[in-house]
Amino acid sequence: PLPPQYFLRVVSDRWLASETQLPVSFRHLILPEKNLPPTELLDLQPLPITALRNAKYETLYKFPQFNPIQTQVFNAVFNSDENVFVGAPTSSGKTTIAEFAILRLFQQNADGRCVYLVPNEALADMMFVQWHKKFSETIGLRVVKLTGETGADLKLLARGQVIVTTADKWDILSRRWKQRKNVQNVNLFIVDELHLLGGEDGPVLEVVCSRMRYISSQIEKQIRIVALSSSL
Protein backbone atom coordinates (compact mmCIF):
# COMPACT_ATOMS: atom_id res chain seq x y z
CA PRO A 1 0.00 0.00 0.00
CA LEU A 2 1.07 3.57 -0.66
CA PRO A 3 2.08 5.70 2.32
CA PRO A 4 -0.40 8.49 3.15
CA GLN A 5 2.08 11.11 2.00
CA TYR A 6 5.66 11.87 1.06
CA PHE A 7 7.67 14.83 2.25
CA LEU A 8 9.54 16.78 -0.40
CA ARG A 9 12.50 18.60 1.11
CA VAL A 10 14.40 21.26 -0.85
CA VAL A 11 17.74 22.55 0.47
CA SER A 12 19.79 25.37 -1.04
CA ASP A 13 23.48 24.65 -1.65
CA ARG A 14 24.26 28.38 -1.70
CA TRP A 15 22.47 29.85 1.32
CA LEU A 16 22.70 28.80 4.96
CA ALA A 17 19.51 27.61 6.65
CA SER A 18 17.59 28.00 3.41
CA GLU A 19 15.35 25.00 3.12
CA THR A 20 11.70 24.10 2.91
CA GLN A 21 9.64 20.98 3.33
CA LEU A 22 6.41 20.23 1.52
CA PRO A 23 4.06 17.34 2.29
CA VAL A 24 2.76 15.62 -0.86
CA SER A 25 -0.47 13.78 -0.12
CA PHE A 26 -1.34 10.53 -1.90
CA ARG A 27 -4.88 10.61 -0.61
CA HIS A 28 -6.39 11.56 -3.99
CA LEU A 29 -3.60 10.31 -6.22
CA ILE A 30 -4.66 9.20 -9.71
CA LEU A 31 -2.33 6.48 -10.94
CA PRO A 32 -1.59 6.16 -14.66
CA GLU A 33 -3.39 3.46 -16.54
CA LYS A 34 -1.50 0.26 -17.23
CA ASN A 35 -0.18 -0.19 -20.74
CA LEU A 36 -2.64 -1.92 -22.98
CA PRO A 37 -1.68 -5.48 -23.91
CA PRO A 38 -0.77 -6.22 -27.54
CA THR A 39 -3.72 -6.62 -29.88
CA GLU A 40 -4.70 -10.24 -30.08
CA LEU A 41 -3.95 -11.83 -33.45
CA LEU A 42 -7.33 -13.15 -34.52
CA ASP A 43 -7.75 -16.54 -36.14
CA LEU A 44 -9.01 -15.11 -39.43
CA GLN A 45 -9.21 -16.75 -42.80
CA PRO A 46 -6.33 -15.28 -44.88
CA LEU A 47 -7.61 -12.64 -47.28
CA PRO A 48 -7.01 -13.33 -50.98
CA ILE A 49 -5.43 -10.53 -53.01
CA THR A 50 -8.79 -10.17 -54.78
CA ALA A 51 -9.88 -8.26 -51.63
CA LEU A 52 -8.17 -5.26 -53.28
CA ARG A 53 -11.03 -5.27 -55.81
CA ASN A 54 -8.78 -3.83 -58.50
CA ALA A 55 -7.27 -5.94 -61.27
CA LYS A 56 -4.22 -3.68 -61.66
CA TYR A 57 -3.52 -3.71 -57.94
CA GLU A 58 -3.78 -7.49 -57.85
CA THR A 59 -1.00 -7.81 -60.43
CA LEU A 60 1.40 -6.15 -57.97
CA TYR A 61 1.53 -9.28 -55.82
CA LYS A 62 2.93 -12.67 -56.74
CA PHE A 63 1.32 -14.49 -53.81
CA PRO A 64 -2.34 -15.58 -53.63
CA GLN A 65 -3.24 -14.29 -50.15
CA PHE A 66 -2.11 -11.94 -47.40
CA ASN A 67 -0.53 -13.17 -44.16
CA PRO A 68 -2.39 -13.13 -40.79
CA ILE A 69 -1.17 -9.66 -39.69
CA GLN A 70 -1.89 -8.12 -43.10
CA THR A 71 -5.32 -9.76 -43.06
CA GLN A 72 -6.16 -8.36 -39.63
CA VAL A 73 -5.17 -4.77 -40.42
CA PHE A 74 -6.49 -4.75 -44.01
CA ASN A 75 -9.82 -3.06 -43.27
CA ALA A 76 -8.26 -0.40 -41.04
CA VAL A 77 -5.57 0.48 -43.59
CA PHE A 78 -7.16 -0.14 -47.01
CA ASN A 79 -10.84 0.49 -46.34
CA SER A 80 -10.59 3.63 -44.19
CA ASP A 81 -8.76 6.95 -44.04
CA GLU A 82 -8.08 6.90 -40.30
CA ASN A 83 -4.61 7.28 -38.81
CA VAL A 84 -3.13 3.86 -38.06
CA PHE A 85 -0.25 2.56 -35.94
CA VAL A 86 0.94 -0.99 -36.66
CA GLY A 87 3.51 -2.54 -34.35
CA ALA A 88 4.57 -5.99 -35.51
CA PRO A 89 7.72 -8.15 -35.57
CA THR A 90 10.38 -7.78 -38.23
CA SER A 91 9.59 -9.65 -41.48
CA SER A 92 5.86 -9.67 -40.78
CA GLY A 93 4.98 -7.86 -44.01
CA LYS A 94 4.74 -4.24 -42.85
CA THR A 95 5.90 -2.95 -46.25
CA THR A 96 2.83 -4.52 -47.82
CA ILE A 97 0.72 -2.81 -45.15
CA ALA A 98 2.27 0.52 -46.19
CA GLU A 99 1.34 -0.35 -49.76
CA PHE A 100 -2.29 -0.87 -48.67
CA ALA A 101 -2.36 2.77 -47.55
CA ILE A 102 -0.72 3.98 -50.77
CA LEU A 103 -3.15 2.04 -52.96
CA ARG A 104 -6.06 3.34 -50.88
CA LEU A 105 -4.91 6.92 -51.44
CA PHE A 106 -4.63 6.68 -55.21
CA GLN A 107 -7.85 4.72 -55.48
CA GLN A 108 -9.63 7.63 -53.78
CA ASN A 109 -7.56 10.49 -55.24
CA ALA A 110 -5.61 10.08 -58.48
CA ASP A 111 -3.82 13.39 -57.80
CA GLY A 112 -2.82 12.47 -54.25
CA ARG A 113 0.68 12.74 -52.81
CA CYS A 114 2.32 10.34 -50.35
CA VAL A 115 5.53 10.78 -48.34
CA TYR A 116 7.23 7.60 -47.13
CA LEU A 117 9.75 8.22 -44.35
CA VAL A 118 12.57 5.74 -43.65
CA PRO A 119 15.39 5.95 -41.08
CA ASN A 120 18.43 5.87 -43.37
CA GLU A 121 19.66 6.44 -46.91
CA ALA A 122 20.33 2.77 -47.64
CA LEU A 123 16.72 1.85 -46.93
CA ALA A 124 15.53 4.86 -48.95
CA ASP A 125 17.55 3.64 -51.95
CA MET A 126 16.17 0.13 -51.59
CA MET A 127 12.54 1.25 -51.30
CA PHE A 128 12.89 3.67 -54.21
CA VAL A 129 14.19 0.93 -56.52
CA GLN A 130 11.55 -1.52 -55.31
CA TRP A 131 8.60 0.85 -55.62
CA HIS A 132 9.76 2.47 -58.85
CA LYS A 133 9.64 -0.96 -60.45
CA LYS A 134 6.42 -1.94 -58.70
CA PHE A 135 4.35 1.24 -58.97
CA SER A 136 5.79 3.22 -61.88
CA GLU A 137 5.98 0.37 -64.35
CA THR A 138 2.69 -1.27 -63.36
CA ILE A 139 0.16 1.38 -62.35
CA GLY A 140 1.91 4.53 -63.55
CA LEU A 141 2.67 6.25 -60.23
CA ARG A 142 5.61 8.67 -60.21
CA VAL A 143 8.00 7.50 -57.48
CA VAL A 144 10.86 9.85 -56.52
CA LYS A 145 13.56 9.95 -53.84
CA LEU A 146 14.73 13.19 -52.25
CA THR A 147 18.42 14.05 -52.60
CA GLY A 148 19.07 16.51 -49.79
CA GLU A 149 19.61 19.43 -52.20
CA THR A 150 16.70 21.80 -51.63
CA GLY A 151 16.31 23.12 -55.18
CA ALA A 152 16.31 19.65 -56.72
CA ASP A 153 14.06 18.27 -53.99
CA LEU A 154 11.42 20.95 -54.53
CA LYS A 155 11.23 19.92 -58.19
CA LEU A 156 11.03 16.24 -57.24
CA LEU A 157 8.30 17.01 -54.72
CA ALA A 158 6.33 18.93 -57.35
CA ARG A 159 6.23 16.02 -59.79
CA GLY A 160 6.34 13.03 -57.44
CA GLN A 161 3.30 11.10 -56.24
CA VAL A 162 5.17 8.74 -53.91
CA ILE A 163 8.11 10.53 -52.27
CA VAL A 164 10.69 8.35 -50.51
CA THR A 165 12.90 10.22 -48.05
CA THR A 166 14.61 10.24 -44.68
CA ALA A 167 13.52 12.26 -41.65
CA ASP A 168 16.37 14.77 -41.89
CA LYS A 169 15.70 15.54 -45.56
CA TRP A 170 11.97 15.95 -44.96
CA ASP A 171 12.72 18.14 -41.95
CA ILE A 172 14.67 20.57 -44.14
CA LEU A 173 12.04 20.60 -46.88
CA SER A 174 9.01 20.94 -44.60
CA ARG A 175 10.29 23.70 -42.30
CA ARG A 176 9.02 26.41 -44.66
CA TRP A 177 5.73 24.65 -45.25
CA LYS A 178 3.74 27.89 -45.33
CA GLN A 179 5.56 28.95 -48.50
CA ARG A 180 5.60 25.47 -50.04
CA LYS A 181 2.19 24.41 -51.28
CA ASN A 182 3.46 21.00 -52.33
CA VAL A 183 4.27 20.22 -48.70
CA GLN A 184 0.73 21.24 -47.75
CA ASN A 185 -0.62 19.03 -50.54
CA VAL A 186 0.63 15.83 -48.93
CA ASN A 187 -2.32 13.51 -48.30
CA LEU A 188 -0.59 10.49 -46.78
CA PHE A 189 2.43 10.43 -44.45
CA ILE A 190 3.90 6.98 -43.79
CA VAL A 191 6.56 6.61 -41.09
CA ASP A 192 8.52 3.37 -41.11
CA GLU A 193 10.62 2.03 -38.21
CA LEU A 194 8.91 4.31 -35.68
CA HIS A 195 10.50 2.36 -32.80
CA LEU A 196 13.67 4.36 -33.57
CA LEU A 197 11.93 7.37 -32.00
CA GLY A 198 13.93 6.70 -28.85
CA GLY A 199 17.23 6.46 -30.71
CA GLU A 200 19.88 8.93 -31.83
CA ASP A 201 17.78 10.37 -34.66
CA GLY A 202 14.57 10.26 -32.63
CA PRO A 203 14.25 14.04 -32.09
CA VAL A 204 14.20 14.77 -35.84
CA LEU A 205 11.68 11.99 -36.41
CA GLU A 206 9.47 13.37 -33.64
CA VAL A 207 9.70 16.90 -35.05
CA VAL A 208 8.63 15.94 -38.58
CA CYS A 209 5.73 13.81 -37.32
CA SER A 210 4.53 16.60 -35.05
CA ARG A 211 4.96 19.14 -37.85
CA MET A 212 2.77 17.13 -40.24
CA ARG A 213 0.02 16.97 -37.63
CA TYR A 214 0.39 20.70 -37.03
CA ILE A 215 0.20 21.45 -40.77
CA SER A 216 -2.95 19.34 -41.00
CA SER A 217 -4.60 21.30 -38.19
CA GLN A 218 -3.52 24.69 -39.55
CA ILE A 219 -4.72 24.18 -43.12
CA GLU A 220 -7.78 22.23 -41.92
CA LYS A 221 -7.10 19.33 -44.24
CA GLN A 222 -6.65 15.70 -43.30
CA ILE A 223 -3.14 14.33 -43.68
CA ARG A 224 -3.42 10.64 -42.95
CA ILE A 225 -0.55 9.27 -40.85
CA VAL A 226 0.33 5.57 -40.98
CA ALA A 227 3.09 4.54 -38.57
CA LEU A 228 4.91 1.21 -38.73
CA SER A 229 7.09 -0.13 -35.96
CA SER A 230 8.72 -3.30 -34.73
CA SER A 231 7.11 -4.75 -31.63
CA LEU A 232 8.41 -3.12 -28.45
Predicted regions and their residues:
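Short coil/turn segments at secondary-structure boundaries
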Residues: 20-24, 128-129
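Extracellular recognition modules
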Residues: 7-11
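Short beta-strand edge segments in extracellular beta-sheet folds
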Residues: 23-32
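Short acidic/polar inter-strand loop motif in beta-rich domains
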Residues: 12-20
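Extracellular Ig-like/FN3 beta-sandwich strand-entry sites
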Residues: 3-5
